[in-house]
Amino acid sequence: MKVQGSKWKVFCTFAPMKEAKIINDPVFGFIKIPRGLLYGIVEHPLFQRLNRINQLGLASVVYPGARHTRFQHSLGAFHLMSEAIVSLQQKGIFIFDAEAEAVQAAILMHDIGHGPFSHVLENTLIHGISHEDISLLMMEEINSCFNGQLNLAISVFKGDYPKNFLHQLISSQLDMDRLDYLRRDSFYTGVTEGNIGSARIIKMLNVVNDTLVVDQKGIYSLENYLTTRRLMYWQVYLHRTCVAYEKVLVNMLTRAKDLIKAGQDVFASPSLHYFLSNDVDAQWFSKHPEALRNYEELDDSDIWSAMKVWKHHEDKILSTLATDMLDRRIFKVEVHEDPIPEERIEGLHIKIAQQLDIPVEDAHYLMNVSTISKDMYNVEDDSIAILDKNGEITDISEASELLNVQLLSKKIRKYYLCYQRFE
């Protein structure tokens, strides 16, 4: 992808590497970023945009401290990657300086393609394209700006580079992404049970046949890590109130899109209006260069500012949903073990329509029926390899005496019914 005119020209050069830039992080302390390519990435507007995107979307509705950003998370993941590289090199794993810089650059940019409220809007404003795909598009754009200096980083990120363990440090069961967000999200939410021993896990990492493994001494830390992930998902990431609040947001944007399609005037920033006015998917991104330019302008503030105007919109449904978002009037939520009966859904449609004096066919905007399923460990998808004292490699499911792998591998399915509260 070519640089869009001179848009990033001022950011395409950076000072040669001298002393490191030091950033004080509340989770890991001082994080050192070498001047040069890596600090050039941090200073780039596409990376700075992450300062305006919440790491946990709308989780602050339950955990008021959870207002940390994708920017902070990316710096934390970079710090852990730096620690992992040093640890592996001390064990005799040969990593060229260029490879070390490439994997550090890749982890810095791994989340650069996230949209407003992180994962919440991935299937609302856009569909059929993941934030990883958009991250890659943005990496290629920055790479053009930096005259190809990110070629190796992009190769590692995509998993094309021969040393597979470098890609695993970015994306696997034990990547630096997960090790940071579990520690960081635990810190900011105050859910202390989620605090993992990331330092020990990193010290126990090793490489066999270009594959990331964990020394047997680290098995207890891994058991705690997998158990912690399970707790954090159901206690934080999939908390019933967070899910309900997210559904209000999704329904509000869906209503705004439908109103625009019907020819009504709906206020939005130019970048937000672009995505509300078009059905943007992977094919659209490939055919319309302006899609990426508009996406790069989007952050949480576009949505919040639109809500403040939509609260006074003449459309009762849009104004109700915007008011719900701003005033924390969250959908009532029910969690069931079995699918929600159609009769229950139809009954709620009628009740909502009567309550708000709207057509029954529009009542679906004020409710949501969804299924959420999650497992914490799947041997077939991405296993964790344990290196024993004899040099043999086994999966943690076989090496652990305490870990209930059957429980962690079981896909838990819950059925959520969220709907507008009645007066």
Language-model features and meaning:
Residues F11-A102, P116-E122, I126-E423:
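Histidine-centered, transition-metal-coordinating active-site segments
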Residues M109, G113-H114:
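Short active-site segment of divalent metal-dependent hydrolases/proteases
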